Amino acid sequence: MTVGRPREFDINQALEAAMRLFWSQGYEATSLQNLLKAMGISKSSFYEAFGSKHQLFEQCLTLYANTLIASFREDLQKAKSGLIFIEKVMKSLVEEASSKGEKCGCLMVNTTNELAQRDKIIAKLVANGTKSLQGVFEEAVRRAQKEGDIPVSKAPEVLSSFLVSSLIGLKTMVKGGADAQTIRDVCGVTITALQ
């Protein structure tokens, strides 16, 4: 029995590099050569570790969603209130619009627009990520209702869907070049609609 050669690269770093590239360029515009260069690996290592570009993309999308959800959950736990968490998320969009760096939007939203209509596997991954995101916002809304910041007469499930829809729209606006004041105004309307 022969033992295969050990991997000569960190699979997590390679996955992270691929995720950033897909996020910046999209799935179709990212070539295998782009991926190999960004990941710092050979073609044979790529196929051995990831199988195909599509399989790699599935892993990248899952990594993105899991990282985003974990970050939001942690922020919610640390927040002084559910409403403060929601306001902080909105404020981060204003900061993103104000930054001079590349505005890539949201990988899940970008992927929905690019692939979800014609790729059932990707559509399911995006739907699962969106459902998890709605779960975090529903938890924030329920907490804010217990704290008296959002009326209990409003359905948490509906408000969480509203917040995720707003977040998706705002991320798209930021990616499209909307100025910080416009994003700030829309965020303000979003928060007001909760109360």
What residue spans do the PLM features occupy?
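Hydrophobic alpha-helical connector segments
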Residues: 59, 73-103, 156-160
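Amphipathic alpha-helical segments enriched in hydrophobic/aromatic and basic residues
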Residues: 22, 31-32, 43, 53, ...
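Basic, helix-initiating cap at the start of DNA-binding domains
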Residues: 1-25, 29-41, 55
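Hydrophobic alpha-helical segments that form the core
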Residues: 104, 109, 154-173, 186-192
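Short hydrophobic/aromatic patch on the recognition helix
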Residues: 40-50
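All-alpha amphipathic helical-bundle segments outside canonical DNA-binding/catalytic cores
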Residues: 124-128, 146-162, 181, 185
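Amphipathic alpha-helical segments used for helix-helix packing
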Residues: 85, 100-121
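C-terminal peripheral helix-coil segments that are non-catalytic and often amphipathic
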Residues: 1, 88-96, 131-147, 166, ...
